[in-house]
């Protein structure tokens, strides 16, 4: 065997070297080296493992936090689509998420920003618009708004012509709708306009699940089941409370304190509707059924507010997705007879929105919600199997059943009127 001395060879110092033993020395040294390297190899492997753990640990922590945070966020009750809800999670919960979302949206919207010119429309969209069933008597026709004067020299069929929606009330149309192209430079842009006869309608204001944040009575967060038999239309609310301290009230109870100087849409207990420049302090008076504020007035006494501007990141007129000046915008106005007008149009600045409201007859007006997700006007027909909702103006991000199920944001419901003082029915 290698590494063992054979007997009878004498002292190792005088013995001649055995050829068979000479390789045994490096072999023995090799074993010793191998035995000496084993602890070092384990230590190296441990060091590599520690480095990997140190590198991976932050990612594991962040991933674990993200999974928990996202799950908690997505499991909260909401009416938003999962993709929109996911975007809001990034914006609100992820560090620098607001910048990331804004930057991404800016790129997307810049690529799809409206361009001037282009081909003319051959017809106007008819989404949500029902043709008139019968000709109205001349006296009733005179009570409605005049045809919207077309902007284009060659108007399309039905452009600016008011059409009734839903069943008549007291022999006349409670709700009228029309469409028209508001700007020569943007021939494919369409404005959707709805007019509500204040003598044939009654309007209620409803808190949503999260807006206003401190609702005195949260209510059903949708059109109450017991009121749907008289439902005519629903539409979106204004800017959130955090975007301008926009207060609101229902049935004499303050949700969020009203702010002096804000434009305020008010429904009085006698059934009349008004837009006022609020100066009454944080609470409403006993004659007010409901109130909803949204920024400053954009039209006053028939004239545009001189402080209007096209800044897409204006703290006064609302931040837009992607920092674009032209986005979906909505607004409400009051005409000379005290009737309510609602407008929704894509590719609008706050100035062009005000001009649309001015053109359709508003003498006072205010901006409501903006950006693609929130504009919502829905009219209803009472069919044999219940309500048939129809979107007026396209919005693929919202279903026609919005407001028939609990919604995150506040909204308005338009009803056939009931006798007596107006209150907001929560049942």
Residue ranges and their predicted role:
Residues 52-70:
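Hydrophobic membrane-insertion alpha-helices, especially the h-region
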């Amino acid at each position: 065997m290698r590494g063992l001395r054979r007997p009878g060879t004498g002292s190792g110092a005088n013995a001649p070297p055995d050829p068979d033993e000479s390789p045994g020395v490096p072999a023995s040294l090799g074993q010793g080296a191998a035995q000496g390297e084993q602890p070092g190899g384990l230590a190296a492997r441990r060091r590599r493992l520690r480095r990997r753990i140190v590198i991976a640990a932050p990612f594991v922590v962040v991933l674990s936090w993200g999974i928990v945070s996202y799950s908690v966020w997505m499991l909260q009750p909401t009416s938003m689509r999962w993709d929109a809800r996911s975007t809001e999670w990034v914006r609100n919960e992820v560090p620098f998420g607001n910048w990331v979302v804004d930057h991404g949206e800016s790129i997307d919207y810049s690529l799809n920003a409206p361009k001037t010119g282009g081909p003319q429309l051959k017809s106007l969209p008819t989404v949500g618009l029902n043709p008139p069933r019968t000709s109205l008597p001349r006296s009733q026709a005179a009570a409605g708004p005049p045809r919207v004067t077309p902007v284009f020299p060659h108007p399309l069929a039905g452009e600016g012509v008011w059409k009734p929606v839903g069943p008549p009330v007291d022999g006349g149309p409670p709700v009228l709708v029309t469409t028209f192209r508001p700007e020569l430079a943007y021939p494919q842009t369409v404005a959707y306009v709805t007019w509500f006869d204040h003598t044939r309608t009654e309007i209620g204001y409803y808190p949503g699940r999260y807006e206003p944040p401190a609702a005195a009575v949260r209510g059903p967060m949708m059109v109450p089941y017991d009121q749907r038999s008289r439902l005519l239309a629903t539409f979106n609310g204004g800017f959130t409370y955090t975007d301008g301290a926009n207060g609101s009230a229902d049935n004499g109870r303050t949700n969020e304190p009203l702010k002096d100087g804000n434009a305020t849409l008010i429904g009085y207990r006698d059934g009349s509707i008004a837009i006022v420049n609020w100066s009454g302090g944080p609470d409403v008076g006993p004659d007010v059924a409901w109130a909803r504020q949204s920024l400053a007035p954009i039209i006053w006494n028939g004239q545009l507010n001189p402080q209007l501007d096209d800044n897409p990141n204006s703290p006064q007129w609302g931040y837009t997705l992607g920092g674009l000046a032209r986005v979906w915008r909505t607004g409400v106005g009051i005409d000379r007879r005290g009737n309510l007008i609602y407008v929704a149009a894509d590719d609008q600045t706050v100035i062009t929105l005000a001009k649309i409201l001015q053109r359709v007859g508003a003498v006072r007006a205010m901006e409501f919600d903006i950006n693609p997700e929130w504009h919502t006007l829905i009219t209803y027909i009472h069919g044999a199997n219940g309500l048939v909702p129809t979107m007026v103006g396209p919005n693929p991000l919202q279903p026609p059943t919005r407001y028939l199920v609990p919604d995150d944001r506040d909204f308005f419901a338009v009803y056939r009127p009931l006798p007596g003082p107006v209150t907001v029915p929560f049942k």
